[in-house]
Amino acid sequence: MKTVLSKYVKEMRKQYHLTQVELSEKSGVGLRFVRDLEQGKTTLRLDKVNDVLRLFGMEVGPVKMQMEDEG
């Protein structure tokens, strides 16, 4: 299942004119990891996700959630 994160990484990779192999080499993660990330795998190591995102000037961090009113 595609996620916001997987779509973002794929869009940015294409915007930077990188192949999956080039992205994996530049970020220091394996090709399999890049493929899993772009395919929306739900269990990924956060440190490796950040290794990829740093190439685009981003990183994953805590974000305050909006809570829905109950009632």
Residue ranges and their predicted role:
Residues 1-4:
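A detector for short, charged/polar N-terminal pre-domain segments
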Residues 7-22, 26, 51:
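Short basic helix-loop element that most often maps to the first helix and adjoining turn
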Residues 28-42:
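Recognition helix of helix-turn-helix/homeodomain-like DNA-binding domains
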Residues 42, 61-71:
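Short, charged recognition helix plus adjacent turn
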